[in-house]
Each structure stands twice: as structure tokens, then as C-alpha cells.
Design a protein with these regions (language model features):
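Outer-membrane beta-barrel initiation region
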Residues: 43-182, 228-232, 240-244, 254-291, ...
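N-terminal secretory signal peptides that target proteins for export/translocation
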Residues: 1-22
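Internal, well-ordered alpha/beta segment that forms a basic, Gly-enriched binding/recognition surface
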Residues: 214, 218-222, 226-236
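Bacterial N-terminal signal peptides
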Residues: 25-37
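C-terminal outer-membrane beta-barrel translocator/porin domains of Gram-negative envelope proteins
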Residues: 114-123, 131, 153, 206, ...
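A short, conserved beta-to-alpha structural element at the edge of catalytic cores
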Residues: 421-444
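Outer-membrane beta-barrel translocator/channel fold
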Residues: 179-221, 340-359, 436-457
């Protein structure tokens, strides 16, 4: 039951979809991650011929945005040289060699089916250091039973450790409105838990297991530019148990040391019906137009415990605002966003700990931390981000975030309790269901505790939609 949407992960930052080429773009991302690499190399490109001065006039002066580019270039020059010469160029050289050998077309024709290549089965893998990796398959079928009916399936896991899968049916109507039906299930024993509150320590790392089933129906109504309204309903079941991962202690063992108390909802789990509503006002235009604009959004998820005693319910709600500046008109976008998140009980029963506000991981703000690293009743995060195109359907991203979780309605907020999260990586934007990702990130302790780096994340591969 994911209650929030990342300000960056909205359709306006993606390439305009082409139904006849959906399979090609998805497979290109997979092959780029698993075989060829995601970037298009420029190292071996022939030198460009100078443009003749046909008009007899000097070139136009640089724009203010182009003048401002030197600031992030100087600040992030060490990161740039690392990604450019250790990642992009070597991988790009491999891609050029593979294209000369016609490997991409051979693999594309092997993994996709039908005269228009509207269906296919593709192997995927994802590694996120700190949890078990995943291997599996991603299957797609566009216009499956009628035009606009698109099916997506993921089946992933790791031998003797975990297993998960999802099935999505997305129906796109002629008006561009859509209905998504989704069913997912997962069983894995390696979920991290550090306690609840803003001052939890990395040294309190423990593991719990989860069995989860979720079914939902979501309506999406695009509006002006990238604005939209989204509404959905669903049913969620979760059961928890003592977990394991390598030598890390289980949640029950760590709780016995006094590091934290066992959280609400553990180990009994819960079953809940939930309702979700999102409204986003976004002035940005779709690709390939420039990416400047403003986004405001508000969203809420209300959950109701089923057959729970005492009666339980909760409301997760959040608001966010972001400004985006395309510094040169070519999708090199600097953005600043502010986000607040809250979770409130609606009954006499407590909120299950997995329904509290959470920071960390790939979806929530502050990706330099593990998923679920920071949990409590509310959170506030400010994020500065720079995103730029690297190759076809591939963007680079650098971000710095400042924030933390707090008590009810930001109770206990103090500047000294803030943490820093930094991340850099590559990510594809060719599909809403499975994307290539390469991320290197880190997070710190609270400033009152010294602000030292105590969390490191490295992940790469094809996301599995779970």
C-alpha cells in the first residue's frame, strides 16, 4: 500500500510512449542493463564538421540558464568524471561492439513475439546490496484482448529465500484515461527494521519476514499538461515473522537486547481495505519540450482493518511542492522540492508499522537509506535534484535530500535531528512497469549524533514492480 508518489516519477519527465514500440523500448532497457549497458557512447563518434556561418552573423550569446550550468558542473565534477569515464564510456564501447555484431536485433527478435512484436518474455535481474537479489522474468502483451488492453507480469525470487510475482492489466481508453487492475504476492524473510523514530541507529539493524498479498484497481485521469487525478481501491493482507539475512539478527532477537520494542502489528499482521486519492497540478509539458515548470500535489490513503479487534483504521496523507528549471532547454533539469508526509490513526487500534510514514529505498524520498530505514508518524524532506539525458530512454540523476521522520504531525522536529541523503545514478524511463536502475547512495546519522555517514546503498538491474 504505497501512499506517496515521488515528485520526479511523473509522466512529464518521460519520453512520449509509442504503443508499437513499447516492447522495443522495454527490451532495450533490459539488454542495456544485462548485456550492453544503458548509455550510448560518444567516445568513438567522428568529429563534427563546424557549422558554416550562412547568415554572416556571430552565434547568439549564451542564455542565463547556459551560464548557470557551470555551477553544478564545478560542484559535481568529481561525480561526473566517475560516471563518465568509469561507467558510461566503457559500457558505451561494449554497446558499439554489440551493435556492430547485430546482437540487439538478434536478441530483440528472440525474446519478442508476433508480427508487430507486441508480446514477449524477458529475463530480468536486480541487485540491491543489503537484501537478497532477484532473478526472474518479465512478460508483456500489448493489445492483448482488445486495443488498449495491456498485460504485464513479473515472476521473481531468489532460490530458497524469497518469491514474488505480480499481474497487471492496464486498459487505456481512447480519451487517454486508464484503468489498472493489479494483483501481487510476495514472501521474503530479509526486510530490514531499525526501530521507530528519528534517532534510530544503523547498528540496530534487524530482519523480519513478510507474507503479503495485495489487489487493487486504480483509475488515472490525465488533465492539463502533466496534471492528473488518480483514484483507487484495494485489499491488502500482510503477516510478519522473525526474519534472517546472512549474520544479521532477527527482529525478535534484536528486540530482546533492548534496542527497540516490537512494533505494532508484529507478528499478527493485518488485513485491510484501502482507498487512495491523488490530485496533481503540474505545469510541465511532455517530452520533447523543455522540462521547466511547477508541480503541486496532495494525496491520501485511508485504510480500514478487517475483522480486527479493537477496531483499527488509519489515514496516510501528504503534500508536496516542487519547482523545475530546464537550464538549457534540452531536459537538463534542476529541481527543488519540499514534501511532508503524515500517518494518523482513525480507530482505537494502533497503526501497523508497515503503514507508518517511511523514508528510504527506491520509491520513498531519501534513497541513500535502506527501505524502511526511517519510520514514524510523520516526515519532512527537502530535495535538490539534477537530472539530465544520457542516451535513448536513459537519464542521469544526482540528488541531495535533507529530512527525517518525526512524531505525530512533526512533533519533536528539531534541526539537529535532520539527516542527509545523497545519491547518483542512471535510470531508464521507457516503461512504468520495469525500468533499468543504477544507484549509488549514502545516508547519515542525525546532525546531533555527529552527522557521520552510516548507510550505503548500491543497486543495479531491472526493477520488478514489487
Amino acid at each position: 500500500m504505497e501512499a506517496h508518489e515521488d515528485l520526479e516519477d511523473v509522466p512529464v519527465t518521460t519520453r512520449a510512449p509509442r504503443r508499437s514500440k513499447a516492447a522495443r523500448s522495454m527490451l532495450a532497457a533490459v539488454l542495456g542493463a544485462c548485456v550492453l549497458g544503458p548509455a550510448v557512447a560518444r567516445a568513438d563518434d567522428p568529429p563534427r564538421r563546424p557549422l558554416p556561418d550562412y547568415a554572416g552573423r556571430p552565434p547568439p550569446p549564451p542564455t542565463p540558464g547556459q551560464d548557470l550550468l557551470w555551477v553544478p558542473r564545478v560542484i559535481f565534477s568529481p561525480v561526473y568524471f566517475t560516471t563518465e569515464f568509469l561507467i558510461r564510456r566503457p559500457i558505451g564501447a561494449l554497446e558499439i561492439a554489440a551493435e556492430r555484431a547485430n546482437i540487439p536485433n538478434t536478441l530483440y527478435n528472440f525474446f519478442t513475439f508476433g508480427p508487430e512484436h507486441k508480446s514477449g518474455i524477458v529475463p530480468i535481474a536486480f541487485v540491491d546490496f543489503g537484501v537478497n537479489p532477484s532473478l526472474g522474468v518479465y512478460a508483456f502483451w500489448d493489445d492483448a484482448f482488445f486495443k488498449g488492453d495491456n498485460l504485464r507480469m513479473h515472476f521473481v525470487g531468489w532460490p530458497d529465500e524469497w518469491l514474488g510475482g505480480s499481474i497487471v492489466q492496464r486498459i487505456v481508453f481512447p480519451s487517454k484515461d486508464s484503468l489498472q487492475l493489479k494483483l501481487l504476492g510476495i514472501r521474503r524473510p530479509d526486510q530490514p527494521f531499525f526501530g521507530i523514530g528519528p534517532s534510530t541507529l544503523q547498528s540496530s539493524l534487524s530482519r523480519y519476514g513478510i507474507d503479503k498479498v495485495d489487489g487493487s484497481a486504480t483509475f488515472d485521469f490525465p488533465m492539463w499538461r502533466a496534471s492528473k487525478v488518480e483514484a483507487g481501491v484495494g485489499v491488502h493482507y500482510a503477516e510478519f515473522y522473525d526474519g534472517h539475512y546472512h549474520s544479521d539478527p532477527g527482529i525478535e532477537e534484536e528486540a530482546r537486547t533492548g534496542a527497540f520494542a516490537l512494533p505494532d502489528g508484529y507478528p499478527g499482521g493485518y488485513t485491510a481495505e484501502y482507498n487512495h486519492l491523488l490530485f496533481a497540478l503540474d505545469s510541465r509539458r511532455p517530452f520533447p519540450e523543455e522540462g521547466s515548470g511547477v508541480r503541486l500535489d496532495a494525496q491520501a490513503t485511508q485504510g480500514n482493518g478487517i475483522a480486527s479487534s479493537p477496531a483499527s483504521g488509519w489515514l496516510r496523507w501528504q503534500g508536496s511542492a516542487g519547482g523545475f528549471l530546464d537550464v538549457d532547454g534540452h531536459r537538463r533539469v534542476v529541481s527543488l522540492s519540499l514534501q511532508t508526509l503524515f500517518a494518523d490513526p482513525l480507530g482505537s487500534g494502533p497503526i501497523p508499522f508497515t503503514e507508518l510514514v517511511s523514508l528510504g529505498g527506491d520509491v520513498a524520498p531519501m534513497p541513500g537509506f535502506y527501505q524502511g530505514r526511517l519510520i514514524d508518524r510523520s516526515a519532512a524532506v527537502a530535495t535538490l535534484r539534477y537530472r539530465w539525458p544520457v542516451g535513448p530512454f536513459i537519464d542521469g540523476s544526482m540528488q541531495a535530500a535533507l529530512g527525517n521522520v518525526f512524531g505525530e504531525h512533526l512533533e519533536g522536529f528539531e534541526p539537529g535531528l535532520l539527516r542527509f541523503s545523497g545519491a547518483i545514478g542512471l535510470e531508464s524511463d521507457s516503461s512504468p512497469d520495469s525500468n533499468f536502475q543504477l544507484l549509488v547512495g549514502f545516508g547519515t546519522e542525525t546532525f546531533d549524533h555527529g552527522g557521520q555517514i552510516d548507510s550505503f546503498r548500491l543497486s543495479f538491474g531491472i526493477s520488478n514492480g514489487l
